[in-house]
Amino acid sequence: TGRSGPRWLCVALVVGRVSIAPAQAARFSTVIIDPGHGGKDKGAYWGGVRESHLNLKVAKELETLLKRRGIRTVMTRRSDVFVSLSRRAQIANGYRHAVFVSIHFNASTNTAIKGAETYYWGSTGRMIAGAIQRRLPARCQVRNRGVRRHGFTVLVQTRCPAVLVECGFISNSRERLRCSTQWYQQTAARAIYDALMACR
């Protein structure tokens, strides 16, 4: 997600909780796709691989799948530009019956750590996060690091169901090579897509 140190050094936290009825997840007609970082915020950088670029590649693959299904998509960025965390949430809050999916890749100073994990804040986000975790790690053949609740700004400030997906650790040399392949990016996007469809 663009850090080698603690997560809270890179993402502002907001106190509070947004309560959303679980039924909303079944009614979404719009998916807000949020490729993490971008522009001056490059995210993690290991072995010549920049997280912000990987995030955008997976996001575009997901957008293609959703559009083929006839689902409206909104990208918080389409190129290597900076978009503030609050602005990302603001974009999401401009749509009704939407879900928000923030796409990231992880990093740690402990280069042995690897795997995929999904974060949520509200109760509906937890359902979507669980659906993603049941698919993405198995299909991408990486360790399942589980579902976690964390107060990232983009999760707390959005009024719709929201999740943040960490697709793998680019600080781990073997996982970084796999994450850099088109196969991995397409497989991760398909797993997220199938999870969203299962929650719809």
Q: What residue ranges belong to the model's regions?
A:
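Sec-dependent N-terminal signal peptides of Gram-negative exported proteins
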Residues: 4-23
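Residue-level recognition of conserved structural "scaffold" positions that shape functional pockets
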Residues: 12-15, 43-46, 175
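Short glycine-rich His-centered loop
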Residues: 29-48
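Active-site-proximal helix/loop segments of hydrolytic enzymes
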Residues: 26-30, 49-200
